[in-house]
Design a protein with these regions (language model features):
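A short, aliphatic-rich alpha-helical micro-motif
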Residues: 21-25, 110
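Short acidic active-site motifs
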Residues: 16
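Conserved beta-strand termini and adjacent loop/short-helix elements that scaffold enzyme active sites
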Residues: 8-10, 66-68, 97-99
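Signature of lipid phosphatidyltransferase scaffolds
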Residues: 1, 10, 103-168
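Short, flexible loop segments at the rims of nucleotide/cofactor-binding pockets, characterized by
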Residues: 4-10, 40-42, 93-94
Length: 168
């Protein structure tokens, strides 16, 4: 590891993030505005950070995700809320921040060793068709600052409301 930030772009951000999450052993902390699951049974050739997060939770990694309540209020139940529910069923903890101010940050911290900060949401379009930009940091001070912010946002956030099984 190095203390020099590395620039990530549309060609490499999803692969780097997915590899880091696939290797996670202890924690994955995520801030995101939008989380939209890749439909179950649909695979595409690009790396899939959402599936990596879901799989990390299934293998016992402590996954915590904070998303904007604004998304929950404005998008149909088939997108953000259903994606969050899938993560919860996999073993992740998901919380929503109140709509004001809107959480628009996108960051992923893996095992308190790697911090990904960028423009990409957890969505297929961010992987397949958007122009995204970000940075990978492994500086202990930056990671500690992020984790302090994450803890304060986690304390302010509310648990994701769970849908009734069967969608009722």
């Amino acid at each position: 590891m190095t203390d020099t930030p590395r620039l990530l772009n549309s060609a490499n951000w999803a692969a780097r993030l997915t590899m880091a999450i696939d290797a996670a052993q202890n924690t994955v902390h995520v801030l995101t505005f939008t989380v939209i699951a890749t439909p179950q049974g649909v695979d595409f050739e690009q790396p899939d950070p959402y599936r990596a997060i879901e799989n990390a939770a299934k293998r016992g990694v402590n996954v915590r995700l904070i998303r904007s309540a604004t998304q929950h209020e404005t998008l149909p139940a088939t997108s953000g809320h259903a994606a969050a529910a899938r993560l919860i069923y996999a073993g992740a903890q998901v919380r929503c921040l109140p709509p004001r101010p809107t959480l628009h940050a996108k960051a992923h911290c893996v095992d308190n060793k790697r911090l990904f900060i960028g423009s990409a949401n957890l969505s297929r379009s961010s992987v397949t068709s958007n122009i995204e930009l970000g940075a990978l940091l492994d500086n202990a001070v930056d990671i500690a600052d992020f984790e302090a912010l994450f803890r304060s946002l986690w304390a302010a956030a509310q648990p994701e409301p769970m849908p009734h099984p069967g969608g009722r």
